[in-house]
Amino acid sequence: MQQVAIYRNLQKNCLSIQSRERENYGKIIGYCKSIFLKRPKFVVREKGRLRVLKEGRKNVHAFVVGRCPDLNLWSWQDRDIKMGGNPTTKVFYDPYKYSTFVDKDGNPVYKARAVLVNTNYIQADITKEN
């Protein structure tokens, strides 16, 4: 499994896959429409967010970082998906409204058990582990 960071690429209308492995750290290693990650963390760089607010222009400052079980990428239809039998929650990020990723009720989300990142939404299994 490879550690990667995913962000929405507004120029190419897709997701950029950035390596988080030591030898290629920060290098773009691919593009996709959707990707599945295990044990993701939702990261927002506050300085980048503040720059968006100041300049009114988006920049790369929010990522989903996790382990990709297979870089043979696939696309999913927009539908409800159950990961590991657990229900999923849609997770959003809007730098103009929130300083973190949030669920549909506006509650902050920092990590999940698994996540499907799509160009239009993020679907996460945020159930607590026992």
Residue ranges and their predicted role:
Residues 2-9:
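Structural detector for short beta-strands of small beta-barrel domains
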Residues 13-16:
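Short aromatic-glycine-enriched beta-strand elements
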Residues 18-117:
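Acidic, low-complexity, intrinsically disordered interaction modules
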Residues 121-124:
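Cysteine-centric segments in proteins
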Residues 127-130:
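Short acidic DE-rich linear segments
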